[in-house]
Amino acid sequence: MGSTSQEILKSFCFNTDWDYAVFWQLNHRGSRMVLTLEDAYYDHHGTNMHGAHDPLGLAVAKMSYHVYSLGEGIVGQVAVSGEHQWVFPENYNNCNSAFEFHNVWESQISAGIKTILVVAVGPCGVVQLGSLCKVNEDVNFVNHIRHLFLALRDPLADHAANLRQCNMNNSLCLPKMPSEGLHAEAFPDCSGEVDKAMDVEESNILTQYKTRRSDSMPYNTPSSCLVMEKAAQVVGGREVVQGSTCGSYSGVTFGFPVDLVGAKHENQVGTNIIRDAPHVGMTSGCKDSRDLDPNLHLYMKNHVLNDTSTSALAIEAERLITSQSYPRLDSTFQATSRTDKESSYHNEVFQLSENQGNKYIKETERMLGRNCESSQFDALISSGYTFAGSELLEALGSAFKQTNTGQEELLKSEHGSTMRPTDDMSHSQLTFDPGPENLLDAVVANVCQRDGNARDDMMSSRSVQSLLTNMELAEPSGQKKHNIVNPINSAMNQPPMAEVDTQQNSSDICGAFSSIGFSSTYPSSSSDQFQTSLDIPKKNKKRAKPGESSRPRPRDRQLIQDRIKELRELVPNGSKCSIDSLLERTIKHMLFLQNVTKHAEKLSKSANEKMQQKETGMQGSSCAVEVGGHLQVSSIIVENLNKQGMVLIEMLCEECGHFLEIANVIRSLDLVILRGFTETQGEKTWICFVTESQNSKVMQRMDILWSLVQIFQPKANEKG
């Protein structure tokens, strides 16, 4: 974190009772996490001593050598628990922390430290503060420390922590004034300034909101706070919304996220903020909040100014407004489009401009026009009309066509005329934007795969009938009012062409098909081409490259790789060899280790037998030879130690460079070297080997002797 954390630590000791501040940072050391001293600040100006005569300065300097593991000492325990701890050494008698006081904090206590505060700052680490005087416990100061380090790591996370803390501390930042007094007349001629302020902050706030936004983001977002803060500064010098000590307007919940309200254009910052405003007691669309709904007004009057949980307030407000306002959406905005006085929404705190009101009207007109288009498209599909080039009805089969009986009454107006689509009416005019766009593909594909042939009307009709039955059971019973509007002229100022009350029947089920995303935009005109289009994604399926696998490695294979890695470390020279040679070397190594204990027992027995032979004067059979030249004489002795095939080979040489050559010769004779050593005797070297024949094979001593003579004979001839 660098110099920024140094400045934060310095701020803790500036004009306060704290004399030093230390930041312990979490770091990886091998396979474990440790706490090491990252930054420290010591206020040496408060003391008269300097340098080597300052015991507290030396104590702070010694802290840089300490390393805490997680759970070790008070610092490690605080890092694990995530809490804070106030330590007063004069009355602290916890035996579990005796090591901490006698070894780590002994120099600090001897320097006069009377209060130590240890605070966990999330994933950053731990902050430790010390004071020469006794400091009373203060939870607000602890929260202040955490907020500063959270802001240093992630400013947005610190803002969310501020919001939660404000809600917990009952610091609701709304002013305590009655809602009836918040009328637009209290702030005259300020709407233009508010609009300018919102437009200036729009681009910066949108950038911050889109880049820092996540699904778990709290409702009171920083972008809303910044806009309302700017607006509050402009409104005639009177700040209606006041900030709390936890942050800039952190206690005010400005409503729900844009996605929950259903807004499709996030660039309308002013519109979204004003739309969110009613959820905290500021109403829009009428002069008085009592005009909305008596239940909503009563709830706001009793709870808004007293409730300490802004999240509960927002949820309750959303429930009331959704249940009371949305059913009257058609009539409200139709009346709004016919009058000029009601075209702009009057807010009790901020009076919106006419442009922002028009944004509301256009957005609602677009949403209602989409619903009208979808209802008309449902009616056309239910009447059995087939578009030119469409294969929706062909794919669904004859069962879908049979549901058209008696449905043409839905298209009849009050004068008895039936509306039919014109030839020049395009598909896009009768198709709305679906939510799940590929639902039709999935339904038809399932029908085709289950039956094996999309053109089999009998099997297809059964699947469609079962699907229709399920939808009919899920659809609530009752009456519906269908507003049939011309999709070409779907403006809000035109009255609906027909309003027909119908019972819940198969036309509503057809409407359910259309509402969940069915559309007739396929360009092909036959069922064969439709089936071919469904098979195209199967052919374009990518194959994995050789050596690559999308599936995770099985656990047993991972264990095998780990064991091979351990073998490479244990077996000599096994780090760079192949797996086959590694296994071969491992087998030889294990066989050698298996015979170690057996060889040790044999060596001890042979040594005891040799001592007994020397005491009794008995000599074992031996064979000796001297290989000599002009300047060199070498003695070789081959002796049987016992009847188990153990052979003692002794040589006296003038050079010690023959040891490895002799060992290779012995191994070539299928003898196992149990023991081998050299010893210097004057100017010569004595070499001794204790060997054993493999597989109980009887080895003649002359064979061993002759093989060893071949080593010395050529060298003696060369020097001769």
From Swiss-Prot:
Residues of the bHLH domain: 544-593
Superkingdom of origin organism: Eukaryota
GO cellular component: nucleus
Biased composition (Basic and acidic residues): 545-558
Compositional bias (Polar residues): 522-534
Secreted recorded as keyword: no
SUPFAM superfamilies hit by this protein: HLH, helix-loop-helix DNA-binding domain
Any one GO molecular-function label of the UniProt entry: protein dimerization activity
Assembly: Homodimer.
Protein role: Transcription factor that may regulate root development.
Entry similarity comment: Belongs to the bHLH protein family. LHW subfamily.
Name of the protein in question: Transcription factor bHLH155
Annotated source species: Arabidopsis thaliana
